[in-house]
Design a protein with these regions (language model features):
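ALDH superfamily catalytic-core signature
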Residues: 158, 193-327, 390
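Residue-level signal for inorganic ion chemistry
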Residues: 26, 71, 132, 164, ...
Length: 458
């Protein structure tokens, strides 16, 4: 039986043949991947249902459809994106032509998370394959059913010398084993804690990395917003996957003049979307495991509870829960919630909210609800985050035309669409000098040449 190291070495040998660099070959593989995905859709839905209790609708919209978008965009644009990109040549280097040549890195390691185990593993794989790399995939051990169907799909499309699915059952042990190997690029999605471990391991070989992490993404609700619409969109964004979304609105800063009315709208909207008992709704998902269930449950402070708070320990479900009068000293504000809790903080002055947001780690996303164009521009220009959505939640992540990634503690590197293709490509600068002219001023001896050079290069 081959060891992991031997399999990775096989990938390296296969990459050196140059087959993955052929653009038509890449396109055909992506088309085949799309065809297999379509034939296996129901199995994907079943796996996500078992792992996270996601409905087929949620699974399609937030996982499968986004993967199709990425595949289609790459198939359509690979030839254009792969062309050498001509750039200007400085006058002092004439006669010459300059261009940027995009080339694949080689063997890429992709470590996927549990919360969107299909999409957040497949999306980076698509960019990696489109750019001409081989890939080693390590899905999350916390989503075992999705990992199984991923393995089935990948084996129908790729030989393991091209794309290798690593069984995640050994969890931390297999990650440690992988990180001892030398890769040409590492793409990790998960917590900041593990992200630091990945980055430290990558530094041993000076391997470039992309870290898609998370953090506490703020949601600011100003008094001039469309209140009912804001509540509807916030409930949708917060409760997708039971709050286990890296860009979920983590906490809500609500203007004090509308706080009570907003909480009522929030309660109404939870009932509209999931009924009077969300724990019985077929559209309401669960925490991924008992550990996460207990962690999120510990954040519910009964003294600040105004709505929800019930749970089902057998199914690992926690009701949508609203907490009022929350402060930064409360446990729920110590780290990313990653669960269906709405902590409400009130504010009077937008500048103060911006100051408080900026005093924390830079978030993966920021949301602002307002109809005031000047205040919208102020929030965008005065804060730093991986991405921003105005008057909605999450939707910026679904666009293949926008870069998605973190900043600071929420991650590094951006992908989706062309940004994925560029991410997994080394940008090689090339200058092709002509031979019919050779100015000797650059060669020694340099006596009496400085004055002339200063006139040219100023």
């Amino acid at each position: 039986m081959e060891t992991l190291r031997e399999k990775i070495n096989k990938q390296r040998k296969y990459f050196s043949t140059g087959e993955t660099k052929d653009i038509n070959f890449r396109i055909e593989k992506l088309k085949k991947l799309r065809d297999v995905l379509k034939s296996e859709e129901e199995k994907i839905f079943e796996a996500l249902k078992k792992d996270l209790m996601k409905s087929s609708f949620e699974s399609y919209v937030t996982e499968v459809a986004m993967v199709y978008d990425e595949i289609n965009m790459h198939i359509k644009n690979i030839k254009k994106w792969s062309k050498k990109r001509r750039v200007k040549t400085p006058l002092v280097q004439f006669p010459a032509k300059s261009f940027i040549k995009l080339e694949p890195y080689g063997v890429v390691l992709i470590i996927g998370p549990f919360n969107y185990p299909f999409m957040l593993t497949m999306d980076p794989l698509i960019g990696s394959i489109a750019a001409g790399n081989t890939a080693v995939i390590k899905p999350s051990e916390s989503a075992p059913e999705t990992s199984k169907i991923l393995k089935e799909i990948l084996e129908k499309v790729f030989d393991e010398k091209y794309v290798l699915h690593v069984n995640p059952e050994r969890g931390k042990e297999v990650v440690e084993e992988l990180l001892k190997e030398k890769f040409d690029y590492i793409f990790f999605t998960g917590s900041a804690t593990v992200g630091k471990i990945v980055m430290k391991a990558a530094s041993q070989y000076l391997t470039p990395v992309t870290l898609e992490l998370g953090g506490k993404s703020p949601c600011i609700i100003d008094k001039d917003c469309k209140l009912e619409l804001a509540a509807r969109r916030i409930v949708w964004g917060k409760l997708l996957n039971s709050g286990q979304t890296c860009v979920a609105p983590d906490y809500l800063y609500v203007h004090k003049d509308i706080e009570e009315e907003f909480i009522k709208k929030l309660e109404e909207e939870i009932k509209n979307q999931f009924g009077n008992n969300p724990l019985e709704s077929e559209d309401y998902s669960k925490m991924v495991n008992e550990r996460e269930f207990n962690r999120v449950l510990s954040y519910i402070d009964k003294e600040k509870l105004v709505f929800g708070g019930n749970y089902n320990r057998k199914t690992f479900q926690i009701e949508p829960t609203i907490l009022k009068n929350v402060t930064w000293n409360d446990p729920v504000m110590e780290r990313e919630i990653f669960g269906p809790i709405f902590p409400i903080l009130s504010f009077e002055n937008l500048d103060e909210v911006i100051r408080l947001v900026n005093s924390k780690d830079k978030p993966l996303a920021l949301y602002y609800f307002s109809e005031d164009k000047n205040k919208i521009e102020k929030v965008i220009n005065s804060t730093s985050s991986g991405g921003v959505t105005i008057n909605d939640t999450l939707v910026h992540v679904s666009s293949s035309y926008l870069p998605f990634g973190g900043v600071g503690n929420s991650g590094m590197g951006e992908y989706h669409g062309k940004y994925s293709f560029d991410l997994f490509s080394n940008k090689k600068g090339v200058m092709n000098r002509k031979t019919f002219l050779d100015l000797k001023i650059r060669y020694a001896p340099f006596l009496n040449k400085l004055t002339i050079v200063k006139k040219i290069m100023k």
